[in-house]
């Protein structure tokens, strides 16, 4: 096994069990519900919806702090002063986490043993980069930290992600679209496809109709647009996704020739933005 330890935020939506298996250390991001701020992953993502139902407000999210990184890094280097750490960051344009890590390692004796890579992805998009890098390290245990960082950049560039919210209520409540836009969108049953482009969440084509009906069209179009490889595809979902969507996407993936399908549930951070019932796609070119 490679001696390189991977670091990522909980916003990557990698489970604790998978992180342990892949030699990945998770740094908490944060979710604020009213006057209370909690670590992402310390409570069920379903609670995000419960809070919105009670208050009409979406919880706010925040990145990992320098202290969060210092806590994890101090533990790593106290156990092994010669450790090497590759931090595969949540999109740096969407959160402070990347800069927090920079601050955390400033003037530390282990600063030269830590490399930072902005994956320019969020949620399972970031998670897919972390997983692929971890598997590459298992196949290349002799790789240097610089080689691993370069490979992670390559993997991140090849990773494509999009998701579709069930409705616009959470985007409206979070200030990401106006009341009028949300009202019209919900009345017309419109669902914007949010694609992660250069680290930013960009609204693209609007699909109309039931989520289970548009799922197959989105998969076909997203696959063709990017020429996704057929060896593996991830489907992601927030809490309370309709089971019919899973059935449709599994069948369409099989019809399109995808060899392996992995479903991953999002945590609290992306659920705050996408709301319940959302689903998405992560693939590689």
What are these regions (language model features)?
Residues 38, 71, 204:
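Short Asp/Glu-rich motifs
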